[in-house]
Amino acid sequence: AVLVNNPTYYGICSDLRAIVKLAHSRGIKVLTDEAHGTHLYFGENLPVCGMAAGADMSAISMHKSGGSLTQSSILLTGKAVKADHVRQIINLTQTTSASYLLLSSLDISRRNLALRGRESFARVAKMAEYARNEINSIGGYYAYGRDLVNGTSIYDYDVTKLSVYTLDIGLAGIEVYDLLRDEYDIQIEFGDICNILAYISIGDRIQDIERLVGALQDIKR
């Protein structure tokens, strides 16, 4: 099978429909790792989700952007996959004493997204776009956006992701990450050599965005 991340940690998406079409034409199944793509199933003007693109199975980490408890995820299966067989394999590789706390949180989050998912993630995308514009206006930072899309290596971009390039202010991403945590009490997702990633969720408010933007402006000084 072919395994595709959709999207990557930074929000980059491949041409998933083309990958699925090519793989299926050769009798190969496609599995999508959508650990950071739960919202793609509910958002408008977002990259295509795995199952809509024709993937055969997709693992979605509801706890990352869907609101369920940590460790809880859902495995989606398409028509070409025998769900009973998948269930048998899962039963062989995991505990038979499932956590009903985690299962309950999945069901509660599923219901919440079914009822309010579109409006919730539209608000997330709006907050991310606001943050992107504000951060880029500071100078020295670059918050990635749809301007990266080139139709090939970067086919689409997940606008709910707030990935920011920091090297031009003279600090590595991990340094900015540490400063935000230690000096401003702001815990973001991660920092690497060049970037930071702030994960905006359905639980965030515009005040949280303002705090982050203000802290980044202060750090740049």
Describe every region a protein language model picked out.
Residues 1-148:
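Conserved PLP-enzyme active-site core in the AAT-like
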Residues 130, 136-221:
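Conserved C-terminal alpha-helix-loop-beta "cap" of PLP-dependent enzymes
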